[in-house]
Amino acid sequence: MDAVNIEQIDQEITLNLQSIDSDLSYCFNKITKDIIPYVTRYGQTCEDITNSSSWLKEMFQQSANVQLVTDQAVESAGQVLEPRTSLFPEVENETDEFHTVDQYPALSQTGVSSAGAPTTKTGGSVKQDQFQDQDTDELTQDSAMEKQRKKRKVSLQIHQHFNSSSSSNSSMENDISANSSPIKTIPPETETGTETHNKIQGELAKPGTVIHFNSKRD
């Protein structure tokens, strides 16, 4: 009985060792064929990323080496600082123009300030040039309006002239047509009466009379 049990146990151990060996071989094949290639490609990708971002590393290192020189450090070293140029123009208090009555200088008759006005290349002040430009603009506008008024007046006169001439021509034509008519009207007898009017009435033929004309025959 003991020998049978020993052989049975030996067989079971052998079977278990074989299963373990097969499992180990499977794991080895899985690691070498599937896992190691992926790890290799991952390492290569990481190396490429590191090489590509190396310039960032150098940039940050160089920026860390920058030394900012302050005014106190320069003064302690005995150097004289030059005045810094400002981006904004400086405004003098004398030329400030605020909306107050006291700070405006006296104005002359032409409306130009007599003092404190900036001058131009021609010698006049800027405000004076501005007022002169405004005056010239107003003069040009006035002259243009005056020209338009004159044109309207001339056109109105021409229109009236042609209307009056047409009316006089029509009246003259009416008179000519009336005088050229073959039938002449005789004015009625006035209350006082004149010899000329009676003579004209006597010369007129009465209705129903026959008028004979002398005709010469060859």
Curated annotation (Swiss-Prot):
User: Where is region (Disordered) located?
Assistant: 109-218
Question: Pfam families annotated for this entry?
Answer: DASH_Ask1
**In its UniProt entry, what is this protein called?**
DASH complex subunit ASK1
Its main localization is nucleus
Q: Which InterPro entries match?
A: DASH_Ask1 (IPR013964)
Which family is this protein grouped under?
Answer: Belongs to the DASH complex ASK1 family.
Q: Would you tell me the Gene Ontology cellular component terms?
A: cytoplasm; DASH complex; microtubule; mitotic spindle; mitotic spindle pole body
Biological source species: Kluyveromyces lactis (strain ATCC 8585 / CBS 2359 / DSM 70799 / NBRC 1267 / NRRL Y-1140 / WM37) (Yeast)
Purpose of the protein:
Component of the DASH complex that connects microtubules with kinetochores and couples microtubule depolymerisation to chromosome movement; it is involved in retrieving kinetochores to the spindle poles before their re-orientation on the spindle in early mitosis and allows microtubule depolymerization to pull chromosomes apart and resist detachment during anaphase.
Look up the record and give one Gene Ontology term from the biological process aspect.
mitotic sister chromatid biorientation
**Nucleus is among the record's keywords:** yes
Cell location: Nucleus; Cytoplasm, Cytoskeleton, Spindle; Chromosome, Centromere, Kinetochore
Spans of biased composition, class Polar residues?
109-131, 172-181
The encoding gene is ASK1
The UniProt record lists the keyword Cell division = yes
What keywords is this UniProt entry annotated with?
Cell cycle, Cell division, Centromere, Chromosome, Chromosome partition, Cytoplasm, Cytoskeleton, Kinetochore, Microtubule, Mitosis, Nucleus
Description of how the protein assembles with itself and partners: Component of the DASH complex consisting of ASK1, DAD1, DAD2, DAD3, DAD4, DAM1, DUO1, HSK3, SPC19 and SPC34, with a stoichiometry of one copy of each subunit per complex. Multiple DASH complexes oligomerize to form a ring that encircles spindle microtubules and organizes the rod-like NDC80 complexes of the outer kinetochore. DASH complex oligomerization strengthens microtubule attachments. On cytoplasmic microtubules, DASH complexes appear to form patches instead of rings.
The major lineage groups are: Eukaryota, Fungi, Dikarya, Ascomycota, Saccharomycotina
- For bias type Low complexity, the affected ranges are 182-193
PANTHER family per the record?
A: DASH COMPLEX SUBUNIT ASK1
